[in-house]
């Protein structure tokens, strides 16, 4: 196993088409990063290499790549996908740099192909599995509660499987992601995996593993007291509303979902999903900690020792693992949904 040179202290392993190239690129590696965000349909990875003399063989699009990194607890797989692009840049005095970008979803495959199909009286889980099979997806895993949500009618009208999954995720308050030949639909803000298991908590402790923080536990603009969606009721010949109240007495503004739902059940799901997004956006920020491969979008981050009003629990919205020539593995966490003592300072005002 290759050990990174001075500054790159993390044991790493990079496989291209199943071949270990860690040692071959060791002296050329400038920076490596892997990003996993709940709002994007696929994980991304980027490898930046010193391409002096143009000696590195230019990578082909669609080549498979795996990246394994190690933290204090051991090594783990952090990315599996395919090369999406390769970019060369250089100038007269700065040398040459080759940047290889990869995505967890096969963007060359049928997942991006537009489909024309519809479903009558179908569950979300069943609709995703059928559309996924047509897109070459071998396995679709859906949170058990989400899988049972039924719709009287669903359609893909010139819509890809990727777009279909993201649309359903927005409508039911979920996160959709494609990883290789698998697709996942999990609840947002629930802190659970697609099978319903708890994701755990990642600590960020000042004086221990916390490098830096930039957090605003209270953001006023996204806050609302209620989320409301509507649908047209043909029996009553008028629009009906479905609402979800939010536990926030700092505002009396109501969030109105812009587009109407197909029926009452869909409207209730849209209102609940919008309420979850409001809660998530009520605070925001980021922390950078020692490399921690346990961090996943949807898990909790417990910030301690920063200061009163900042310390507390936050939901992890995105994770980026990175290392370069000047530092060992670090993990950046984008945060939202402040909880517990976040935003509270019990000290008396001066």
Where are these regions (language model features)?
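A generic local secondary-structure boundary/capping motif
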Residues: 89-90, 173-175, 214-219
């Amino acid at each position: 196993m290759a050990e990174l040179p001075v500054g790159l202290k993390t044991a790493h392993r990079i496989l291209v088409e199943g071949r270990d190239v860690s040692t071959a690129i060791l002296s050329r590696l400038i920076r490596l990063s892997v990003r996993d965000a709940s709002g994007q349909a696929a994980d991304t990875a980027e490898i930046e290499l010193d391409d002096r003399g143009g000696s590195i063989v230019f990578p082909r699009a669609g080549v498979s790549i795996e990246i394994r990194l190690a933290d204090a607890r051991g090594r783990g797989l952090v990315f599996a996908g395919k090369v999406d692009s390769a970019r060369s840049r250089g100038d007269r005095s700065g040398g040459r740099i080759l940047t290889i970008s990869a995505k967890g979803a096969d963007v060359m495959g049928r997942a991006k192909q537009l489909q024309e199909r519809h479903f009558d009286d179908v569950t979300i889980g069943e609709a995703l599995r059928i559309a996924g099979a047509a897109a070459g997806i071998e396995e679709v895993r859906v949170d058990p509660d989400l899988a049972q949500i039924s719709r009287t009618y669903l359609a893909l009208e010139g819509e890809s499987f990727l777009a279909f999954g993201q649309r359903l995720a927005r409508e039911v308050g979920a996160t959709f992601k494609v990883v290789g030949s698998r697709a996942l639909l999990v609840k947002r803000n629930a802190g659970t995996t697609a099978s319903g298991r708890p994701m755990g908590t990642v600590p960020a402790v000042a004086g221990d593993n916390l490098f830096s923080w930039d957090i605003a536990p209270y953001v006023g603009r996204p806050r609302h007291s209620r989320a409301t969606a509507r649908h047209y009721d043909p029996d009553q010949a008028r629009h009906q509303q479905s609402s979800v109240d939010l536990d926030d007495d700092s505002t009396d503004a109501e969030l109105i979902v812009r587009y109407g739902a197909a029926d009452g059940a869909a409207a209730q799901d849209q209102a609940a999903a919008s309420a979850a997004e409001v809660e998530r956006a009520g605070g925001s920020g980021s922390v950078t900690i020692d490399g921690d491969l346990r961090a996943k979008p949807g898990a909790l981050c417990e910030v301690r020792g920063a200061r009163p009003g900042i310390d507390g629990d936050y939901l992890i919205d995105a994770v980026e693992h990175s290392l370069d020539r000047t530092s060992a593995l670090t993990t950046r966490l984008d945060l939202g949904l402040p909880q517990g003592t976040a935003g509270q300072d019990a000290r008396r005002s001066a």
